[in-house]
């Protein structure tokens, strides 16, 4: 983080587009970099940009997806991964997926890279429609972005997780989940149509504990649970959730293990899934917990076998009344192979849903609604 802005500035002055994986870059420096990039007609992806796919080439944490005519712009790494993977596995394809960094749609940055990415994909003849993904943007920034969307002749899908369905231009549709965004981009195709929410076996009602490596997947799970009236607490609370309180044993706990407070001084859990081992063991042994909810994120840059690692931990625990539910974000073409990861989890007794949103819905059913 300390030297990222200086190195990015050097790259811009050499006429290059820049992707900044590093975080901990001050907001003021991010704004300055993006303003300079705009003057030079160059794009800054990031800081804290963990995912992009440019001309079919995955960068950082990204998945091997089919080429196609759907462009994606995201202030969200695992949000991009979930949507592009769902589209690809359903037979669609991606022209480009452009990460802009999680703070681009803040008031301080003003959506500079998002506007430039929209301009780029709008002018790209290989891109037929565009998906926007973000946690709730600042209202003024959202208004400006949606005004730019309305100037396009291309159809847009807008997935601002946790935001209200804003008044959208005529060429845009709102999606409340990442799965819904992928479905809309595919022309309304229903994903996971054969998946039943009815549990294989009933479990006692109780709390849900979610242990996530993906920040946006963690946010989406919180929103699904809160929408159904659950009391949800998190270290990164989404709209409708509250901050974690160690003394409150009544709330569902949905934890983002990739947040700064967990990754300072150690690898991200997508690189080292052992980051959630101890919490997983504790949750499985907690009599007040009915369901443990996990994400498994694969692809370029990720751990070689996250499902196998989780299965090893689960094998330490006697088959229990606690249900374990997961989804796998990724594709069959990824090095870890999505079907192989699913089979490993199912072999360990995990109930695997077709998407992160459906995994949260299944957890709700298993925990008694």
Spans of model-derived segments:
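Catalytic-core regions of core metabolic enzymes
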Residues: 1-369
């Amino acid at each position: 983080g300390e030297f990222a802005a200086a190195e990015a500035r050097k790259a811009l002055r050499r006429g290059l587009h820049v992707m900044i994986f590093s975080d901990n870059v001050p907001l003021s420096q991010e704004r300055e970099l993006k303003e300079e990039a705009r003057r030079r007609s160059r794009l800054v992806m990031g800081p804290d940009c963990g995912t992009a796919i440019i001309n079919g080439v995955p960068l950082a944490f990204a998945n091997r997806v089919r080429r196609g005519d759907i462009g994606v712009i995201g202030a969200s790494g695992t949000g991009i991964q979930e949507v592009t993977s769902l589209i690809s596995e359903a037979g669609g394809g991606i022209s480009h997926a452009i990460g802009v960094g999680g703070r681009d749609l803040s008031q301080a940055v003003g959506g500079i890279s998002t506007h430039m990415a929209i301009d780029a994909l709008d002018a790209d003849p290989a891109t037929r429609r565009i998906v926007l993904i973000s946690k709730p943007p600042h209202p003024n920034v959202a208004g400006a972005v949606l005004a730019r969307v309305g100037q396009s002749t291309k159809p847009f899908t807008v997935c601002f997780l946790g935001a209200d369905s804003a008044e959208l231009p005529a060429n845009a549709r709102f999606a409340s989940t990442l799965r819904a965004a992928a479905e809309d981009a595919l022309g309304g195709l229903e994903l996971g149509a054969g998946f039943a929410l009815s549990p294989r076996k009933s479990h006692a009602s109780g709390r849900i504990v979610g242990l996530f490596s993906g920040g946006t997947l963690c946010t989406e799970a919180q929103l699904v649970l809160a929408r159904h009236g659950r009391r949800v607490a998190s270290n990164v609370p989404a709209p409708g959730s509250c901050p974690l309180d160690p003394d409150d044993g009544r709330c569902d706990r949905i934890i983002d293990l990739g947040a700064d407070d967990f990754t300072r001084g150690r690898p991200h859990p997508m690189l080292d899934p052992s980051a959630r081992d101890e919490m997983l063991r504790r949750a499985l042994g907690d009599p007040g917990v009915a369901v443990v909810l996990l994400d498994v994120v694969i692809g370029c840059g990720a751990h070689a076998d996250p499902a196998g690692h989780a299965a090893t931990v689960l094998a330490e625990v006697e088959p229990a009344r606690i249900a374990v539910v997961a989804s796998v974000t990724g594709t069959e073409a990824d090095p870890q192979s999505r079907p192989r990861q699913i089979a490993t989890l199912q072999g360990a007794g995990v109930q695997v849903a077709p998407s992160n949103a459906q995994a949260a819905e299944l957890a709700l059913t298993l925990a008694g609604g």
